[in-house]
Amino acid sequence: MVYLFVIDDDYIVYVGNYPSSDTKIAILPEKLREFYMHIHNGWFESISGGLGLLPIEKIQFLDESERGLPQEILQSVELSKTYYVFHNGGGFLCINTENAANPKSLVWWTNNRPKLGIDFWSFLDSWIEIGFLY
């Protein structure tokens, strides 16, 4: 599905893929999993492919890609248990599943220490809003 927004006489196009039944969505927290299963398999800006929720097939654990950061930063989070669902060019909105019953959210920056203990939905809303203002 294509969403066309007009903001200050500029057109912004977002894409929402068909809902997913991919077994990989089991890693997502319940509310996010419901979005992927019943509404969209990702919802993102059409040109960059970012500024929104990534399709399940593009979600990656942080240990699956080299970040080029100092070891002290890389060790601040268990990379194999932290995956990102959103990127904005400078940071990644992530979910850490070290405690699967109570996943934590964080921002993984491309050039700085992660911001831990964030409210996932507040950051998601804010970053989508920022995308509309570009």
Language-model-detected regions and their locations in the chain:
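A broadly tuned preference for mixed-charge, low-complexity surface segments
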Residues: 88-89, 102-106, 132-134
